[in-house]
């Protein structure tokens, strides 16, 4: 099990000094799928990181739609191929498909058609992932951020429908708790879980800072399932210099005591 933070690589040296294992960057900063190869600078940025960049989130910009009438298969295919090839070249193992602005179902649009569009997109993710040796993970988002794929259980419907080793499931503690989802769904999804995001429910602060969130029930399920993948802190207003060490200690202690 490796612990990282969703942040810029500019914080990597500080993270390394505190004992973190990796950086989770933003796809729009590091993979830049909208740019041509001669414009891409993410490889140069990654080479300056004091820690490996093992994962990336925010797969899609809001301008690229996965659902609705503005779905453009050709543009998405070009974008995904760039992302896959670039992720492989800099050693990124996991790319997160959250992208609420891209997959949000437009008002009045047929929901079953939107679900079919997402299934097609997930198939495309699996193909690109397989070709480049990376794993895409489907992230559930709370309803305030997106109106589709709001739970682990719902994310799993797309993972199971795709049925491919390059497409797996992410568990996000903040979104899980926000939706009051039973942790038993995590146990059911355990064989397909390949990435984890952490934040307290109260204020979406980094683990332990609110003093009110207990990760042990979820960590217990992960440990029972022999989870040995990446776990990233994805929190609001996380002052890494001030709080990074105690957050890391808190997560490690909760894991050990689960």
Q: Can you say where each PLM-predicted feature lies in the sequence?
A:
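N-terminal substrate-binding region of glycoside hydrolase catalytic domains
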Residues: 14, 18-39, 57-65
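Short hydrophobic interaction/assembly module
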Residues: 45-73
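Glycine-rich, proline-tolerant flexible connector loops at the mouths of alpha/beta enzymes
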Residues: 26-48, 99-109
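Active-site acidic/histidine proton-transfer and metal-coordination neighborhood
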Residues: 66-168, 178
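Active-site beta-loop-alpha junctions enriched in small/polar residues
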Residues: 6-10, 26-30, 56-61, 100-102, ...
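Short, conserved clusters of charged catalytic residues that mark active-site
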Residues: 39-40, 120, 180-184
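A generic structural signal for well-ordered alpha-helical segments
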Residues: 45-49, 87, 129, 222
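Histidine-acidic metal/acid-base catalytic patches
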Residues: 1-21, 77, 82-85, 91-93, ...
